[in-house]
From Swiss-Prot:
The keyword rRNA-binding applies. Belongs to the bacterial ribosomal protein bS6 family. Keywords: Ribonucleoprotein, Ribosomal protein, RNA-binding, rRNA-binding. Binds together with bS18 to 16S ribosomal RNA. GO terms for molecular function: rRNA binding. The keyword tRNA processing does not apply. One of its GO terms (cellular component) is ribonucleoprotein complex. This is Small ribosomal subunit protein bS6. It comes from Geobacillus stearothermophilus.
Amino acid sequence: MRKYEIMYIIRPDMD
């Protein structure tokens, strides 16, 4: 998993 993928899962509002 990539860093941005983890961030996206944690904060899906970060379109």
